[in-house]
Regions:
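N-terminal hydrophobic targeting signals that begin at the initiator methionine
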Residues: 1-3
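Bacterial N-terminal signal peptides
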Residues: 5-19
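N-terminal pre-domain segments of enzymes
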Residues: 25-70
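Buried hydrophobic positions in well-ordered alpha/beta secondary-structure cores of metabolic enzymes
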Residues: 49, 164, 225-227
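Feature captures the catalytic cores and cofactor-binding loops of soluble hydro-lyases/lyases
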Residues: 60-68, 72-223, 236-301
Length: 301
């Protein structure tokens, strides 16, 4: 008897393929599945089911560092949401955006033939690395798993980078490489996190999923997550935790600001500021928050 053992990853793909209709779309995850696999998100969604964290929350997350996001995620049990070790092109203000995922695998002719046939049925134009750009909307960050390939693993050059920025007004993350860096550097505010750069063109790969769960190094990434880039690396925040990350970080910053002000004014000692605050201190702090127009408050202890 011949026994065949399937890996968990292969089993997952087979389940999706067998559950899909006869003319399955390339993305493999349906709208209902994107909703099913993000059950804790109760807010708005894109037409394809991807969670849509509000722009107002995205703006607040631009002040968040990897360390600050890490604390909230760890407390919530999310221990695989950070990945470091990137080369950054056009570093500037922090990269923040709603994740659109894409996954590539080494090319296998029989599978790639089916993928291209399905692409034609879906009226997709150009090479497979351009298909993923067509679905981007303002505020999106394209996150591509290209299995760390550098030589012949260049997902974009300056032309497709221009197209990405025109659609999303945001950046790119690729566990692979890019080319035409001189041209990419001429695209203002287009921030790229990449594993490397190479002059070769993209070859011998195939696009096997759009807006499906992917792995970026040690991080598990879902469509609709919020990508936050800073000098330490990339943090992928589940949508249901995005506002809490923003709230907790804002509170930390405001506590520091008020504490420094109290020390400069001589109203409290360093020991008082660094220890458990009294009820009177909390009341004064909350009154100061109200005066600043902040909506968050410190609860009484």
């Amino acid at each position: 008897m011949i026994r065949i053992t399937l890996t968990a990853g292969l089993m997952g793909w087979l389940v999706l393929l067998l559950a899909a209709p006869a003319h399955a779309q390339l993305d493999l995850f349906s709208k209902s599945q994107r909703i099913e696999f993000t059950p804790e998100w109760q807010g708005d969604r894109f037409p394809d089911g991807r969670p849509k964290v509000p722009d107002s929350v995205l703006a607040r997350l631009k002040d968040v560092s990897a360390d600050e996001a890490w604390d909230v995620l760890q407390d919530a049990g999310y221990r695989s949401q950070f990945e470091g070790g990137w080369k950054v092109i056009n570093p500037g203000e922090r990269l923040v955006g709603r994740v659109v995922t894409a996954v590539f695998m080494p090319k296998r002719p029989d599978l790639d033939s089916v993928i291209r046939q399905n692409g034609k049925k879906e009226n997709r134009i150009g090479d497979e690395n351009s298909w993923i750009i067509d679905i981007l909307t303002p505020g999106d960050v394209l996150v591509v798993d290209l299995f760390g390939k550098i030589r012949y693993g260049t997902i974009v050059g300056d032309n497709l980078s221009t197209a990405i920025y025109a659609k999303s007004h945001n950046g790119l993350i690729v566990n692979g490489a890019v080319r035409d860096v001189t041209g990419i550097q001429k695209i203002p505010s287009f921030e790229v996190y990449t594993r490397g750069v190479d002059p070769s063109a993209l070859e011998n790969v195939m696009l096997t999923g759009i807006n499906v769960p992917i792995r970026i190094g040690d991080a598990t990434v879902m469509p609709g997550d919020i990508a936050i880039g800073d000098p330490e690396g990339l943090t992928f925040v589940p949508p249901q935790l995005a506002e809490k990350v923003a709230d907790d970080t804002e509170m930390d910053h405001l506590v520091d600001e008020w504490g420094h002000m109290m020390l400069r004014q001589g109203k409290y000692t360093p020991g008082q500021i660094d220890s458990r605050w009294t009820k009177e201190m909390i009341e004064q702090f909350n009154a100061w928050l109200e005066g600043k127009g902040s909506k968050i408050r410190m609860p009484e202890r």
